[in-house]
Structures are given as structure tokens and as C-alpha cells.
Amino acid sequence: MAPNAPFARSLRLQRLHHHDPDRLFIVPLDHSITDGPLSRAHRLDPLVGELASHHVDGIVLHKGSLRHVDPEWFTRTSLIVHLSASTVHAPDPNAKYLVSSVEESLRMGADAVSVHVNLGSEGERHQIADMAAVAEACDRWNVPLLAMMYPRGPKIDDPRDPALVAHAVQVAVDLGADLVKTLYVGSVAAMAEITAASPVPVVVVGGPRDSDESRILAYVDDALRGGAAGVAMGRNVFQAPDPGAMADKLSDLIHNSGTRGAARAPAGAAAGAA
């Protein structure tokens, strides 16, 4: 937890960690605005209930979706309201816009909010300004902020370049994020350098759908060995043949992993173990 966070913000951060004070398993269900209806979208409420019952720490949703979800599920997991949006049909899908506010999210019962920034995109300046404004509102209301940071734009050749990912994490930290979601760079040692340098927890993205379950679990294990605090994995959970079973396997790996000692380890130590 942030050492200088006010009581209310610290309390909300602790509530996010339902099963472990150091690790997080988040399932974003915010893809539908960007890509269209989710798989099983007509069953959003039971899907959220299934995830909440299988050791997921937090679920990311857009504000309108909450009208169609039983609040009971969020006595078992945390609600993260996503404030950013764009669609794949836009002239620039990387241009994210704010579609909600911290205050509105609080009225809906949010435990935290999230914003999306595409570092290097043509709309970067607006997204950074939006995140700064959201961070100020989070300070005013003592609400945890999850920053989803992606190197993504016309000058970005390799979005997993460790220097770019480190820069994205630093932008989030400097603007006031409590948690950062970003890309796994593909190397345990390189990821360990990024996570060790970050004063806030870093969770890695789940990425595109992969039908190979063992490959998904190996990816998460590598990220944890690289010091990640956990994952924010959507499609590889909610598009799995059995989302609850997949959530259980990921939760067990994240919360009961033998790599726990490597989490947020000094970069040199992690590199030696890689």
C-alpha cells in the first residue's frame, strides 16, 4: 500500500486485495465498447457472478453494464469502473476519451476506477491530461486509480520494448496511479527491472485469446517471476470454455505461487534467477 495514502484510500486499496495483500487477479470486462459484444454477453450477470465466486479480486466494467449486474456479486469481489472508451471503428481507435467520472463511479459503488492511456498515440496529450484530471479527482475522493498504460502509436515499433514499458509505468506513477496495468516485456529479467523500479504494483495484461491453457499459465508464471503483482486478464478468462475453472487456476497460480519470493525483488536478484 502507498505509505502516504489517506485512510480511506488505503482502505479501498486493501479491499481490492481480497485474497492476498501483495497479489491481484483482475478480470476486465470492458472490451465491449471497443470491440463489440463480449462472448456470452447476454449472460453478463451470471458471468460476473461466476468470476466473483472463483477468487477474482476485481472486475472492470463500464458504468452502463452495472445496471444489468446483481450488486450481490460485489460483496465477493471489487468493482473497478472504467472511465475510458473508444471503438475499433473510429478514425483513430487509439484515441481514448473519458466517458465517466470518479464522482459518478462512486455513486455507483466503485471500489476503484481505471483509465487507459496509449503512450505514443496521436491523442497522447489528451489522454495524459485526462488521466491527470482523473488522478486529481481520485485524490479528492480517496479512490484508488488503476492506470492502463500501453505503448501504442505510429512511432512505436515494438510495444514490448522494456524501455518503452518502463516509461509507460513511470508516467502512470508520476501522474498519481495506485496500480499500473501494462505489457509483459517477454523477459523475466527485464520485467524485474521495471517492477523493482516502480513504487506501485504492476499487473500485466492478458493479451489476445489463446486456446492453449498451459501457455497462458506459463505466461502468468513468467510475469510473476518478473515481479508483477498479478494480471488483468479478460479474454483468456471470459472466452475460456469454463471461465470459472480458468479463474480458479489463475487465482491459485497468482495467490499460491512458489514465485512469491520473486515478486518485486531487486532487479539484480531477479535477473540472476531468470
Curated annotation (Swiss-Prot):
pH dependence of function: Optimum pH is 6.5-10.0.
GO biological process, one term: amino acid biosynthetic process
Summary of temperature dependence: Optimum temperature is 40 degrees Celsius.
Stored Pfam families: DeoC (PF01791)
Principal EC category: lyase
InterPro entries reported for this sequence: Aldolase_TIM, DeoC/FbaB/LacD_aldolase, DeoC/FbaB_aldolase, FbaB-like
Reaction catalysed by this enzyme: 2-amino-4,5-dihydroxy-6-oxo-7-(phosphooxy)heptanoate = L-aspartate 4-semialdehyde + dihydroxyacetone phosphate
Keywords per UniProt: Amino-acid biosynthesis, Aromatic amino acid biosynthesis, Lyase
Matching SUPFAM superfamilies: Aldolase
Family: Belongs to the DeoC/FbaB aldolase family. GriI subfamily.
Quaternary structure note: Homodecamer.
Stated role: Catalyzes aldol condensation between L-aspartate-4-semialdehyde (ASA) and dihydroxyacetone phosphate (DHAP), to form 2-amino-4,5-dihydroxy-6-oxo-7-(phosphonooxy)heptanoate.
Protein name: 2-amino-4,5-dihydroxy-6-oxo-7-(phosphonooxy)heptanoate synthase
Species, as recorded: Streptomyces griseus
Lineage of the organism: Bacteria, Bacillati, Actinomycetota, Actinomycetes, Kitasatosporales
